[in-house]
A protein has these predicted regions:
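Structural signature of the two symmetry-related core transmembrane helices
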Residues: 79-93, 282-296
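Helix-to-loop junctions at the C-terminal end of transmembrane segments
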Residues: 64-76, 267-280, 365
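Cytoplasmic helix-loop-helix junction between adjacent transmembrane helices
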Residues: 110-145
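Juxtamembrane intracellular "pre-TM" segments in multi-pass secondary transporters
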Residues: 2-13, 193-225
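Residue-level signature of mid-helix packing/kink "hotspots" within the transmembrane helices
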Residues: 31, 58-66, 151-152, 261-269, ...
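Helix-loop boundary and gating motifs at the non-cytosolic
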Residues: 9-58, 223, 227, 232-245, ...
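Hydrophobic core of transmembrane alpha-helices in multi-pass small-molecule transporters
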Residues: 104-118, 307-321
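Symmetry-related core transmembrane helices of the 12-TM Major Facilitator Superfamily/SLC fold
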Residues: 171-187, 374-389
Length: 403
């Protein structure tokens, strides 16, 4: 009973609200990377160049995921995220000042990857530290909804800037200012988060070791970790080159981000509480099927603004809720004492997909065209669906064998 009391106080709710606000502000920086293809294209670059800049961030995210736990043990997770926010600010300023492809842009991509990796990894771990397992999925949904709001706002800021006569680079300036503000908020709320952790119990060690990683991989948590990587590839592949897809079909790319963002956020904030009470295996199976339906629409039936918006909404529902469900599975199916390590590997897998896949995606577009990329993404989504369906079927077989 005492473990829940602190979470229901107005001060705690206000703290979590500030936590989500700061997360929203930092997330704008990643959202603006979806404008790189548009920005580079206007300066003689290609989708392959944009994919290279995005994917180079994967290298620094590896370091961020591996060392974020050690950094947390030294200065605490909130201050580590604040430091990551400052690197996001530097990266966005660099993107705004370097609109052409070259070594400088790759360096800023590396800087972005480190900052985003620290933030994205430690955010859920803070939730896991201060929320008991029975309530984690709900709070993961609230956090991820805030982050998705920021991610979606990034490209919309670019569309708004262009509509007002400003260059698309203006969106990166806005994201830099938001990152600075988010970093300040995280620094200011760090003492309150530390106090909340002290009230609820000792903080788990966040260091990742080879032995801990091996134990997590041998557990059931391995499957949601793989699924989030595949889901990240789907999301990264579609979002990073949505400006190119929209131009090819004479559509406004802001419709995709608006539809996707509104659907994902609404589902995570309004429906996630209902989904939490359902069978997680069945839910992941149904939701991955929605993602497949959406991609089929992008391949075969998007011909008008309405169908474009509808496909984005269906993708937002499927992806938005699937992420929340498997994030909870990665935490709750982890071996005893290794929840934080499982979430670190979960984040690492996500980064491999969301940052690594655009490198391949950009080369596919340049060499074979957008349709080939869509078929590749469809194949990835089918594999993801097979894993979800296989887990559900295997459990039924296991239950029948026991009975």
């Amino acid at each position: 009973m005492s473990s829940q009391a602190p979470e229901n106080t107005p001060s705690t709710k206000g703290l979590f609200g500030l936590f989500c606000l700061a997360s929203y502000l930092l997330s704008l920086s990643y959202g603006t990377t979806f404008l790189l293809a548009l920005m580079l294209g206007s300066h003689g670059g290609s989708e392959s160049d944009a994919g290279t800049v995005i994917s180079v961030a994967m290298l620094s995210t590896f370091l961020a995921v591996i060392f974020s736990g050690h950094l947390t043990d030294i200065i605490g997770a909130p201050r580590a995220i604040a430091a990551g926010g400052l690197t996001l600010m530097i990266a966005c300023i660099g993107f705004a000042m370097t609109p052409t492809y070259g070594p400088a842009l790759l360096i800023f991509g590396l800087i972005l990857g480190f900052g985003w990796g620290v933030f994205y990894t430690l955010g859920p771990i803070i939730v896991a530290m201060i929320i008991e397992p029975a309530r984690r999925v709900k709070y993961f949904a609230l956090l991820s909804g805030s982050m998705m709001s920021g991610i979606g706002t990034g490209p919309l800021a670019g569309r708004g800037a262009v509509a007002m006569g400003y260059p698309v680079e203006s969106a990166f300036v806005v994201a830099a200012a938001a990152s600075l503000l988010g970093a300040v908020v995280f620094f200011l709320i760090a003492p309150k988060i530390r106090l909340q952790q002290a009230v609820l119990g000792p903080v788990a060690v966040c260091r990742i070791t080879t032995g801990a990683a091996a134990r997590v991989i041998r557990s059931k948590a391995f499957f949601p970790i793989v699924m989030v990587g595949l889901g990240g590839a789907i999301f990264g592949g579609l979002s990073s080159f949505q400006t190119s897809y929209a131009a090819l079909h004479h559509l406004d790319y802001s419709l995709f981000f608006l539809g996707f963002m509104c659907a994902a956020i609404s589902c995570r904030l309004l429906i996630a509480g209902f989904i939490v009470k359902r069978d997680a295996y069945l839910s992941s199976c149904v939701l991955t099927s929605l993602m497949i339906v959406s991609i089929l629409m992008f391949v075969f039936s998007v011909e008008s603004p309405f169908s474009y918006l509808l496909a984005a909404i269906i993708l937002g529902v499927g992806y938005g809720l699937t992420y929340s469900v498997i994030n909870g599975l990665a935490a709750n199916e982890a071996p005893n004492g290794l929840t934080a390590q499982s979430l670190l590997l979960f984040s690492l897998s996500y980064f491999v997909g969301v940052f690594g896949f655009p490198l391949l995606a950009g080369k596919i577009i340049v060499a074979y065209g957008m349709p080939s990329l869509l078929y590749t993404i469809l194949s990835v989504s089918l594999l993801n669906g097979c894993i979800a369906l296989g887990r559900l079927a295997w459990r039924k077989v296991a239950v029948a064998a026991i009975a």
